[in-house]
Design a protein with these regions (language model features):
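Secondary-structure boundary/capping residues
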Residues: 30, 39, 57-60, 128
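Sparse recognition of residues in long alpha-helices and their boundaries
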Residues: 37-38, 60, 64, 159
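Acyl-donor (CoA/ACP) binding surface of acyl/acetyltransferases
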Residues: 1-19, 23-32, 65-181
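A short helix-loop-beta-strand connector motif used in the catalytic cores of GNAT acetyltransferases and
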Residues: 52-67
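Conserved GNAT-fold acetyl-CoA-binding loop/helix
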Residues: 29-52
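Hydrophobic residues in alpha-helical segments
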Residues: 25, 34, 55-59
Length: 181
């Protein structure tokens, strides 16, 4: 699949990205469909320690996070993450957030596409999973545009703002991704 990877760059998250990350989490719209909460820079600095190794092929490292950069303006527009859920079975899960000022400009689709390409090209992952609130149609479209298949509904999957919310479950197999390229 030819993603608009030229529209975004994925840079490993670093200390200099903390103000942007803090600002992203402070946006009410960012947290509308996700169980995210505002954090101080110090809390984010501690959280950042989990993401210091960015070699996707590392056999034991499980968590990765990148900042999404608009390749034209070089501004930060979002973040994406990848967690190895089951190293033995080669299954991972992705997450992503785009700053509300950058919505409806293709950054989410491009960022997820670039991340999927990176994961399948640089790791032994064979399956990527993702979930999104059933109320977040934009996120569903981002996943579907990148070849993910909606596989079901997880009832009461996450608590968001004190309410259990159903989520769609999506999956993408490496073999399907290779056919779409």
């Amino acid at each position: 699949m030819d993603h608009a990877s030229s529209t975004v760059e994925l840079n490993p998250i670093s200390e200099e990205d903390l103000p942007f990350w803090k600002e992203l989490l402070a946006q009410q719209e960012t947290r509308e469909h996700q169980p995210l909460q505002e954090r101080t820079e110090e809390e984010l600095r501690q959280h950042l320690k989990r993401y210091t190794e960015h070699n996707l092929g590392h056999p034991h490292h499980r968590e990765y996070k990148w900042v999404v950069i608009d390749a034209e303006s070089l501004e930060r527009v979002g973040e994406v993450s990848f967690d190895k859920l089951d190293i033995g079975q080669k299954i991972g899960r992705i997450g992503y957030s785009v700053h509300p000022q950058c919505w409806r400009k293709g950054f989410g689709t491009a960022a997820v596409g670039a991340m999927v390409d990176k994961i399948f090209n640089k790791s032994d992952c064979q399956r990527i999973e993702a979930e999104c609130s059933i109320h977040n149609s934009a996120s569903s479209r981002v996943l579907e545009k990148n070849g993910f298949t909606r596989e079901g509904t997880k009832r009461g999957y996450l608590e968001i703002h004190g309410v259990r919310v159903d989520h769609y479950s999506f999956g993408l197999l490496k073999e399907d991704w290779e056919k779409q390229r």
